[in-house]
């Protein structure tokens, strides 16, 4: 079963991109341009920007190994899970545009696939979430599958983790799950047809799809179908609501979004602790081994530049949104604030380069190889699998090398973290100024 004529592939911000692609497939256009919606506009309608930061410490499977600390940053407003929670990003965007959502949650993969087939038969693509990397030991069915057939998974084993998506082999620390559109489920050929951030389509076998979708039990094999109106009539209100969400959550004394730290003050908190050698959550304390430092710096770079972003920690995309909003709301003053966010995006990109600097050959090579992987994946998808695997293996090799001997001395590392702290502080001040200007204008 396949949705005929579906050819909308590729995303940057995955949630906004999935909605854009389905609206485009359904023939729904933005009323102010009479062209397909842009990702930037949809992202802004959903609340735009966020500022979440966490460092998590995990006990490894092997008790003889030290606890693992991992860095997490989120730059978009609220979480991009697919569920019934109206405060999640996808329902928020859809509700503001008058798009009806049908959400199916079930613990049964068979019932989930029945919903998928029924939706595809009626001409509706289905949005779902797939795990990318997970520990093979964390779920019994994963371990059993791996024992039966190690070749079921792609070639990379990364720090006791396996990749569930054969086409996605970029190392684990950078991404955990993908929001995807399923537009085909063909039982005779044992294929699931889906989209990703690449501009090319992808395929999984049905067992690969079932395992990847079901590995995180709380997601409940969720499938989601959009039923948009033929015409969007409330764009003005949707844009204003999105800007209000962004400003209020980032400038509020305490986060107005339950369970998430979304305040711009987050960046100032990082600036104060990152290079502090006595701080409990300082990076010198948390990430004190070569592999931890490498994972942290590469993850910081990836999340700013290409994981769910096309650079600038989504601030560049928000600049594009404000440019569109100035036309929709008839407020040309928004263009000036858009320019502020464009400059902030450049500041974030500079920070991402600072994390993997040119004057340290191994870190520079990791940065350039990750950029190469991302460009290949975006443009060529599965057709570039050999080159994608080679790039991923190169990053693995660099990680192994720096785990033995990190290329920066303690003094050089302290200097690097101090420079990064300064950049976080400068970003904090710049974002606060831009957000206050936005609040005063609207």
Q: Can you say where each PLM-predicted feature lies in the sequence?
A:
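Conserved active-site-adjacent core of cysteine acyl-enzyme catalytic domains
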Residues: 2-29, 44-230
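Short, charged/polar micro-motifs that form catalytic or ligand-binding hotspots
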Residues: 8-9, 80, 172, 301-308, ...
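Short helix-capping/linker segments at secondary-structure and domain boundaries
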Residues: 24-35, 322-330
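Acidic carboxylate-rich catalytic motifs and surrounding loops in phosphoryl-/glycosyl-chemistry enzymes
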Residues: 34-39, 104-108
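Noncatalytic regulatory segments and standalone regulatory/sensor domains
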Residues: 159-162, 166-169, 173-174, 186-313
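Accessory, solvent-exposed terminal regions and/or long lumenal/extracellular loops of proteins
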Residues: 245-411, 418, 425
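Hydrophobic, glycine-enriched assembly/anchoring segments
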Residues: 418-442
């Amino acid at each position: 079963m396949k949705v005929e004529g579906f050819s909308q592939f590729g995303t940057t911000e995955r949630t906004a991109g999935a909605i854009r692609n389905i609206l485009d497939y359904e023939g729904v256009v933005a009323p102010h341009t009479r062209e397909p919606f842009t990702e930037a506009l949809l992202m802004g309608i959903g609340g735009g920007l966020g500022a979440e930061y966490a460092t998590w410490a995990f006990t490894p499977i092997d008790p003889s190994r030290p606890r693992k600390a991992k860095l997490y940053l989120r730059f978009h407003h609220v979480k991009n899970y697919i569920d019934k929670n109206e405060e999640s990003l996808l329902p928020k965007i859809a509700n503001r545009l008058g798009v009806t959502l049908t959400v199916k949650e079930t613990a049964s993969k068979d019932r989930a696939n029945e919903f998928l087939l029924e939706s595809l038969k009626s001409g509706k693509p289905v949005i779902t979430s797939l795990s990318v990397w997970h520990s093979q030991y964390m779920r019994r069915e994963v371990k059993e599958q791996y024992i039966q057939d190690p070749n079921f998974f792609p070639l990379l084993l990364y720090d006791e983790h396996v990749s569930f998506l054969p086409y996605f082999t970029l190392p684990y620390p950078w991404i955990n799950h993908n929001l995807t559109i399923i537009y085909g489920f063909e039982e005779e050929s044992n294929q699931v047809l889906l989209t990703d951030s690449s501009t090319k389509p992808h395929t999984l076998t049905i067992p690969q799809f079932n395992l990847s979708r079901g590995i995180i039990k709380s997601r409940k094999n969720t499938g989601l179908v959009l039923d948009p109106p033929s015409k969007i009539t409330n764009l003005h209100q949707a844009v204003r609501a999105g800007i209000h969400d962004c400003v209020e959550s980032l400038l509020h004394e305490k986060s107005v979004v339950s369970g998430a730290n979304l305040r711009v003050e987050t960046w100032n908190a990082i600036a104060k602790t990152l290079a502090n050698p006595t701080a409990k959550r300082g990076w010198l304390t948390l990430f004190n081994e070569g592999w931890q430092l490498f994972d942290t710096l590469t993850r910081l770079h990836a999340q700013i530049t290409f994981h769910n972003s096309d650079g600038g920690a989504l601030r560049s995309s928000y600049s594009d949104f404000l440019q569109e909003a100035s036309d929709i709301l008839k407020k040309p003053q928004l263009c000036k604030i858009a320019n502020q966010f464009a400059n902030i995006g450049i500041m974030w990109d500079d920070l991402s380069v600072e994390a993997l600097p040119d004057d340290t050959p191994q870190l520079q090579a990791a940065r350039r190889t990750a950029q190469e992987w991302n460009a290949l994946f975006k443009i060529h998808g599965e057709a570039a699998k050999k080159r994608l695997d080679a790039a991923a293996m190169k990053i693995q090799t660099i990680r192994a090398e720096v785990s033995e001997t990190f290329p920066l001395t303690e003094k050089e590392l302290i200097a690097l973290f101090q420079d990064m702290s300064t950049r976080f502080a400068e970003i904090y001040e710049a974002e606060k100024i831009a957000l206050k200007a936005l609040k005063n204008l609207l």
